[in-house]
Design a protein with these regions (language model features):
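N-terminal "cap/leader" segments of large eukaryotic alpha-helical scaffolds
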Residues: 1-25, 182-190
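Eukaryotic acidic, Ser/Thr-rich intrinsically disordered low-complexity regions
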Residues: 4, 149-192
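Buried hydrophobic core positions in alpha-solenoid tandem helical repeats
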Residues: 8-9, 42-48, 88, 102-104, ...
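Alpha-solenoid helical repeat architecture
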Residues: 12-15, 50-54, 106-110, 149
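Positions within the helices of HEAT/ARM-like alpha-solenoid repeats
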Residues: 18-22, 54-59, 113-115, 152-160
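Alpha-solenoid helical repeat scaffolds
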Residues: 22, 61, 65, 102, ...
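Structural signature of alpha-helical solenoid repeat scaffolds
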Residues: 25-29, 67-71, 123-127, 165
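Flexible loop/turn segments at the boundaries of HEAT repeats in alpha-solenoid HEAT proteins
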Residues: 31-40, 70-93, 127-137, 170-176
């Protein structure tokens, strides 16, 4: 009998967009508890496949799958409600930390598609940390991304700086976020 990860792995190794998207969609449709439980059997396999595969699309697919397994904002929010089933807080923290650590590796990948996927996925981790009120963790992440960007060049440095800016955004007050988001969305239109 094949495990859930073995099924996913064969789809990811195929490098076919439709098959990869089906895996991503299947994980996305899991409820929080299912996803948290599946994480244990799939995270290590996805990160191992990422590290061992030469094909950038397969590595990007691994990042996308890991992003779906991340506890993310809904898990952090359900921790604050006794009316909704949620995984243990320690599990949410541990899994978010594991995903974030992997994404810091993936955001330095030689393939720009992989870096872009990792940058998007990092936003989910940052949102979860924000909901968990883990400001020290976000501050540490900002420092790490700054250090990584200083040691990188070209597009890789740009992607690291952009990820750092995303993290800095979450350190602002709620009003500051609204204003900055508004400026990013409509800034050029306001200047005319």
């Amino acid at each position: 009998m094949t495990t859930q990860w073995e099924e996913y792995e064969s789809e990811l190794r195929a490098g076919d967009a439709d098959r990869v998207n089906a895996v991503v969609d299947e994980i996305r449709e899991m409820d929080i508890i299912e996803r948290t439980e599946a994480f244990e059997g799939c995270f290590g396999g996805a990160t191992d496949l990422y590290r061992s595969h030469e094909d950038g699309y397969v590595r990007q697919s691994c990042v996308r799958v890991v992003q779906q397994f991340a506890p993310r904002l809904p898990a952090a929010v359900t921790l604050q409600s006794s009316d909704v089933a949620s995984p243990p807080a320690e599990t949410v923290h541990d899994q978010t930390d594991a995903v974030c650590g992997f994404l810091l590796e993936a955001i330095t990948d030689e393939d720009g598609r992989v870096r872009q996927s990792a940058k998007r996925a990092l936003k989910d981790c940052i949102r979860a940390y924000d909901a968990l009120e883990e400001t020290a963790t976000i501050e540490g992440l900002i420092e790490e991304l700054e250090t990584m960007a200083a040691g990188a060049s070209g597009k890789q440095a740009q992607h690291l700086r952009e990820a750092k800016e995303d993290a800095e955004f979450f350190m602002q007050s709620g009003l500051g976020r609204i204003i900055e988001g508004f400026q990013k969305e409509f800034g050029d239109a306001l200047d005319s």
